[in-house]
């Protein structure tokens, strides 16, 4: 049986390191997905040239090997352009084309993430976080968890509480992605609480 092991990272570099570590441990690029609003050069995906609204995969976004070599920019209604690779990227291209309701939230729930966590992960990406998910057999789930935890992911329960304390009730797919300035302020408010 397979399951999704999913973690949110405040920093793109943490997620990139986690993906590299997963691949070095023998997880295949076909099992791993990365979704972010950031590109390798530290700019937001919506600052990348060649992105448009709708069902597009735009400019090459990252460097690296394996999964990271396949990063592309995908324009998703609601959040805006995302840097994505892996099975979730394929699903998101379908989302942008209107074949799946719910955008990132729907893609995550379709890949086995429970709805409560999918709301938090989608909101985290909207606010500038980077999501890494691994679709693995139960026998390798603990190994994937250990590798992702080594990169200091967000404590989603603490983050959910922080968001709720500020009035958040759930992910709104119609809300725009945060600007670079809003992301900076978010990091100041929430710090890197784990």
Report the location of each language-model feature.
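Intrinsically disordered, low-complexity, hydrophilic segments
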Residues: 1-194
């Amino acid at each position: 049986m397979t399951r999704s092991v999913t973690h949110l990272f405040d920093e793109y570099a943490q997620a990139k390191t986690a993906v590299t570590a997963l691949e070095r441990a023998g997880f295949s690029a076909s099992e791993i997905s990365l979704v972010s609003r950031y590109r390798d050069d530290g700019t937001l995906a919506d600052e990348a040239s060649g992105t448009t609204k709708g069902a597009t995969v735009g400019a090459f976004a990252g460097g690296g090997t394996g999964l990271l070599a396949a990063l592309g920019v995908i324009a998703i209604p609601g959040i805006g352009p995302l840097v994505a690779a892996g099975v979730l990227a394929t699903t998101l291209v379908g989302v942008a084309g209107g074949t799946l309701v719910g955008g990132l939230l729907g893609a995550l729930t379709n890949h086995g993430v429970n709805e409560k966590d999918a709301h938090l992960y989608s909101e985290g990406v909207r606010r500038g976080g980077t999501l890494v998910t691994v679709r693995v057999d139960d026998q390798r789930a603990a190994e994937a968890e250990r590798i992702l935890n080594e990169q200091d992911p967000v404590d989603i329960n603490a983050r959910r509480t922080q968001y709720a304390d500020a009035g958040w009730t759930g992910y709104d797919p119609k809300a725009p992605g945060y600007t670079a300035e809003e992301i900076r302020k978010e990091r100041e408010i929430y710090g890197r609480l784990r």
